[in-house]
């Protein structure tokens, strides 16, 4: 018997095809952009090396989404702060300074000890009551604590303390600061999509003109709008490809979400140099989404057996046993990977595609296992069955590997071999994505008869209530964030530039699965965010 989820149609249609002839930045914009960039660089270089001014400038540049222009200068500044950290920050009793420097360094991959916060606690390890009205200090501590690793109870306590007191302060704050704190409580810097956050922070800083140099705001707005034009052209090309592929019309059960998936890839890397990587990743996301719908919704167990075997073979001859709708999908999938291979061959990087296909095979095996659980009405064991399979069914290994396909020379064969072994950072990312998805999909899946989700597995295995299962699974997610944070600290096995897509894929999952499955039900809230990022220029 076939299932159906009756997904709503695309909310975007052919909208982005209208940008086929959109030009990039005009001559004035390019000149203005270069001039302003030079001025911001001067501000960064000339600000005193170990000062709150330098810390806040770096933070603002990052939040406004323009730090990719100044990576060298920011790295130099933070390296200098790291080398003199004990001497400067060790002696400081300003919570905002200590927490901000701690976060900026951890964010950059530097390990600094959380013991630096002990000076703000009493003998029992509780934070001093004198801090409860220090809004900027609390907000900085809250953001810093999101970068915690295991055995940092002082940061675990910091999250409880700051969350409680920032919520209590909200009614007393100015409108702009209140909006900023509310946004941070829902979307902390370490757990949100950079482009969506940038759009918000530009508006926050515009409201609070005194706290940020007007030149910097103007530069951020101009940069945002120039990039947005580029995204519109990219989205136009991808929409055309999607229409020519025509799979969702042929497969009426599949979610038509190409714009949402481009937005997903933008969460992984938004910078101009990743144009090719974004294009490939978006297309892989499209195939993963359709594969999910075939295995999760439409395919019979017999059909899924045949498709799994065909994908394992990766040979057009395997098509003969497939049903007509699967033939279309399978042919398109093989053609796509062949095309990517041809493109990468020009740069002697075609070896990458074999790694990507290998991950795709693991993904369909995991989807097939879930289908067998469904058809057998089986509730698997939480740890050794469900979570083990969930590493792959989260699609994170497939997407992380695919995210490297169009990247630069740092994505070596050794790096691909490393990620194919499921290193801890990838397992953590996968666990987070799997469990976040499970939480927001649970009620809907129960209605349609799915029993194999982490919530159901946990309830059955531990005799827990639904609420207890949710609480425990949120704890597991937080513990995996600690593993992920640890995996991003130097020294790393592969260059950090390769770890960023893994981290950013996790951030996208946190963003998309915050209150609901915003990908599946994109007409609810996600469409407004996508409109702001992809379609709505900021008034200059």
Swiss-Prot record:
KW Magnesium (keyword) present: yes
Record pathway: Secondary metabolite biosynthesis; terpenoid biosynthesis
Catalyzed reactions per annotation: (2E,6E)-farnesyl diphosphate = germacrene A + diphosphate
Cofactor(s) this protein cannot do without: Mg(2+); Mn(2+)
Binding residues annotated for Mg(2+) 1, in chain numbering: 292, 296
GO molecular function: magnesium ion binding; terpene synthase activity
Keyword ATP-binding belongs to the record: no
Cofactor note: Binds 3 Mg(2+) or Mn(2+) ions per subunit.
Binding site for Mg(2+) 2: 292, 296
Motif DDXXD motif per UniProt: ranges: 292-296
Domain of life of the native organism: Eukaryota
A biological process from GO: diterpenoid biosynthetic process
Domain commentary: The Asp-Asp-Xaa-Xaa-Asp/Glu (DDXXD/E) motif is important for the catalytic activity, presumably through binding to Mg(2+).
Family: Belongs to the terpene synthase family. Tpsa subfamily.
Protein name: Sesquiterpene synthase 15b
Source species of the chain: Solanum habrochaites (Wild tomato)
High-level lineage: Eukaryota, Viridiplantae, Streptophyta, Embryophyta, Tracheophyta
